[in-house]
């Protein structure tokens, strides 16, 4: 009885300690964004430099490197970070919006507006062609199928009849021919000997 009572409260403080450790630092995604903003590199900051910044400014556990890798991949997939060099978690990264200067953003907006105006005209043409094409196809297909079916049935009926008749005719003359020449040749040989 005493052992059970002492073992149950021992598990609770462990959970409390784990909760305290997580509160020592913010989310890894927030720390990575802060590290990239602090470096202010146009080419982007590497994963190693991000790890150094996080370890020096925040109290992080031993598995911080693996957590940083995972959070970098998530930020790239969500579009928060852009990968300028390398593949996966290795390479250099920068923020998708924060690091770009204001002038480049203004130019990109004007380019996007021009593209948006041009695209609906191009998109409208293929839609018209696509709507016409399917209406023609279903009309043509049932007619072709109807023609093929009756044409195939008489061919199948004729072929087996021809196959059955041929071997019967061919077998009779073959048996009759070899018998006659033997009789003639034997008669000729007998006349020559005389």
Swiss-Prot record:
Protein localization: Nucleus; Chromosome
One Pfam family in the UniProt entry: Linker_histone
N-acetylthreonine PTM sites in chain numbering: 2
Modified residues (ADP-ribosylserine): 104
Ranges of compositional bias, category Basic residues: 105-194
N-acetylmethionine found at: 1
Family annotation (InterPro entries): H1/H5, Histone_H1/H5_H15, WH-like_DNA-bd_sf, WH_DNA-bd_sf
Nucleus recorded as keyword: yes
Protein name: Histone H1.0
């Amino acid at each position: 009885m005493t052992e059970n009572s002492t073992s149950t409260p021992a598990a609770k403080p462990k959970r409390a300690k784990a909760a305290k450790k997580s509160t020592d630092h913010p989310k890894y995604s927030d720390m990575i964004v802060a590290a990239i903003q602090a470096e202010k590199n146009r080419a982007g900051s590497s994963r190693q430099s991000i790890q150094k910044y996080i370890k020096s400014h925040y109290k992080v556990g031993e598995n911080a490197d693996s957590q940083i890798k995972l959070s970098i991949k998530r930020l790239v997939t969500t579009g928060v970070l852009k990968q300028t060099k390398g593949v996966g978690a290795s390479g250099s990264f920068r923020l998708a919006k924060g690091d770009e200067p204001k002038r480049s953003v203004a130019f990109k907006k004007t380019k996007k507006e021009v593209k948006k105006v041009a695209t609906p005209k191009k998109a409208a043409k293929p839609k018209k062609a696509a709507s016409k094409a399917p209406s023609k196809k279903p009309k043509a297909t049932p007619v072709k199928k109807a023609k093929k079916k009756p044409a195939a049935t008489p061919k199948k009926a004729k072929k087996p009849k021809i196959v059955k008749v041929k071997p019967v005719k061919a077998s009779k003359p073959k048996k009759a021919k070899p018998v006659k020449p033997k009789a003639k040749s034997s008669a000729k040989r007998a006349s020559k000997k005389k």
